[in-house]
């Protein structure tokens, strides 16, 4: 069995993580005390992907919870599933990172990191075949971004051949939490480009939009947003946890989605999204799921896939459905919208089918796309970063923790390179020569004629 070790860091990561465990517990029939109360052998068959069976038949999540202040941890402990986690796996400091990446990465976080790594090692040794790590964090704050990326790079050193999947909440364009978000996010992306294998890009604004527009919630709470994220997270790994006709795992996902190693930032979507009141009036069909899943409004990050092209994509369907129909629908999407897919990667959409639907639904699907339009997110953060960095605004908070301005410059140029790479492959065509110079030459001639 292939285990996944779940790590959540910072306030955002811990809140998303707590919601995620509620969803996974419900799917596997685990009650808040860790006892199995389900009704199907399938729930237990591969339960050890996310759970460790302790003495007395209790199931304990393979989760490591870290934060630099005790607040969020305390509320998880007193929450509905607080008693299910192993008490030693709560690792927290007292001081907080104060939304400062440098505190999370170099000073406060660095002091706590060894005790986190001890817990990670202990959990990893409990696995007979560790497939990889999934990390939940945000990039705008101090702990999730600074300490989260520190942990990712340390795990990278120690387990170089395991998959590293992150669910990263990017700062949103309109919903801003702190003024130094662009700094924290840019410094984090700099790390994620190098050390993560797969990054699922989420952002609050897109999630708010889904809540307003599709779920018809008048004032959505973070709980609602986290519920959306956790549905997607559970969808990404359902193939590992339940039998299916076409299975995939984290590594297969990476091989199918990443054409170039640096371009591993994915947009995710989930279907069916229906408002709470209208669920009983909807019938679900594969065409309907497919249509909603590919809908640009369904993406959980504020980048519009219609502004770019898909390099690759993967769809994970859950429920009893005909594989033939799934394949037909996916082909249908590609044929109708062929201009939104790069033509130099043939068959670039992969689908997997898992037989067990999420709790309370007949069928569902999770979408993961590697689209060049994700550069919109990076470009936006980069512009905000440059605006502040040019004036060296707020920089003393970071240099005071021992950081060098050089690091900022490096992170900035790395992010701009990433944007340029996405743009390059968006513009590339199948028939141009190796260096892609033809296009440019033709344009120049065109201009002279005028």
Swiss-Prot record:
Q: Which stretches are tagged as biased composition: Acidic residues?
A: 429-444
| Disulphides | none
One GO MF annotation is: metal ion binding
Annotated residues that bind GTP are located at 11, 69, 138, 142-144, 204, 226
- Which superkingdom heads the taxonomic lineage of this protein's source? Eukaryota
State the CDD domains in the record: beta_tubulin
Which locations, inside or outside the cell, does it occupy? Cytoplasm, Cytoskeleton
- Where does the record place the region Disordered? 426-450
Cofactor requirement: Mg(2+)
**Binding annotation for Mg(2+):** 69
* Pfam family name, one: Tubulin_C
For biological process, the GO terms are: microtubule-based process
Tell me the keywords, alphabetical order.
Cytoplasm, Cytoskeleton, GTP-binding, Magnesium, Metal-binding, Microtubule, Nucleotide-binding
SUPFAM superfamilies referenced in this protein's UniProt entry, alphabetically: Tubulin C-terminal domain-like, Tubulin nucleotide-binding domain-like
Q: Name one GO cellular component term.
A: microtubule
Tell me the subunit arrangement. Answer: Dimer of alpha and beta chains. A typical microtubule is a hollow water-filled tube with an outer diameter of 25 nm and an inner diameter of 15 nM. Alpha-beta heterodimers associate head-to-tail to form protofilaments running lengthwise along the microtubule wall with the beta-tubulin subunit facing the microtubule plus end conferring a structural polarity. Microtubules usually have 13 protofilaments but different protofilament numbers can be found in some organisms and specialized cells.
In the record, the note on similarity to other proteins reads:
Belongs to the tubulin family.
- What's this chain's function? Tubulin is the major constituent of microtubules, a cylinder consisting of laterally associated linear protofilaments composed of alpha- and beta-tubulin heterodimers. Microtubules grow by the addition of GTP-tubulin dimers to the microtubule end, where a stabilizing cap forms. Below the cap, tubulin dimers are in GDP-bound state, owing to GTPase activity of alpha-tubulin.
What name is this protein filed under? Answer: Tubulin beta-1 chain
């Amino acid at each position: 069995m292939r285990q996944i070790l779940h790590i959540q860091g910072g306030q955002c990561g811990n809140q998303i993580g707590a919601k995620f465990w509620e969803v996974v517990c419900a799917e596997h029939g685990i009650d808040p005390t860790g006892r199995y109360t389900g009704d199907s052998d399938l729930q237990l068959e591969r339960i050890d992907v996310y759970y460790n069976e302790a003495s007395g038949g209790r199931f304990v999540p393979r989760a490591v919870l870290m934060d630099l202040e005790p607040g969020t941890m305390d509320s998880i402990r007193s929450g509905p599933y607080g008693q299910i986690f192993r008490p030693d796996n709560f690792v927290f400091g007292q001081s907080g990172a104060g939304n400062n990446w440098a505190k999370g990465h170099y000073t406060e976080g660095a002091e706590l990191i060894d005790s986190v790594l001890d817990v990670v090692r202990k959990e990893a040794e409990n696995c007979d075949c560790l497939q990889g790590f999934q990390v939940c964090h945000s990039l705008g704050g101090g702990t999730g971004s600074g300490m989260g990326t520190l942990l990712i790079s340390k795990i990278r050193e120690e387990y170089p051949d395991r998959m590293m999947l992150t669910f990263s909440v990017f700062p949103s364009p309109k919903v801003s939490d702190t003024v130094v978000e662009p700094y924290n996010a840019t410094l984090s992306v700099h790390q994620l480009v190098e050390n993560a294998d797969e990054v699922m890009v989420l952002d609050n604004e897109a999630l708010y939009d889904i809540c307003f527009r599709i779920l018809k919630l008048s004032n959505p709470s973070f709980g609602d947003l986290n519920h959306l994220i956790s549905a997607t997270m559970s969808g990404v790994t359902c193939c590992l946890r339940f039998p299916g006709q076409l299975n995939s795992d984290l590594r297969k996902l990476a091989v199918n989605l990443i054409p170039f190693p640096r371009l591993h930032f994915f947009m995710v979507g989930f279907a069916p999204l229906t408002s709470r009141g209208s669920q009983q009036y909807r019938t679900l069909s594969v065409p309907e799921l497919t249509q909603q899943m590919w809908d640009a409004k369904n993406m959980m990050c504020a980048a519009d896939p219609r502004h770019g092209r898909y390099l690759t994509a993967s769809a994970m369907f859950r429920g009893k459905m005909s594989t033939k129909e799934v394949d037909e629908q996916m082909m249908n999407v590609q044929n109708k919208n062929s201009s939104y897919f790069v033509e130099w990667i043939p068959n670039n959409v992969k689908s997997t089918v898992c037989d067990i639907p999420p709790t309370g639904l007949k069928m569902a699907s999770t979408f993961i796309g590697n689209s060049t339009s994700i550069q919109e997110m990076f470009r936006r953060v980069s512009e905000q970063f440059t605006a502040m960095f040019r004036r060296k605004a707020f920089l003393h908070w970071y240099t005071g923790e021992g950081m060098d301005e050089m690091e900022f410059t490096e992170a900035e140029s790395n992010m701009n390179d990433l944007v340029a790479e996405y743009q390059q492959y968006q513009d590339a065509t199948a028939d141009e020569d190796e260096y892609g110079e033809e296009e440019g030459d033709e344009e120049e001639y065109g201009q002279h004629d005028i």
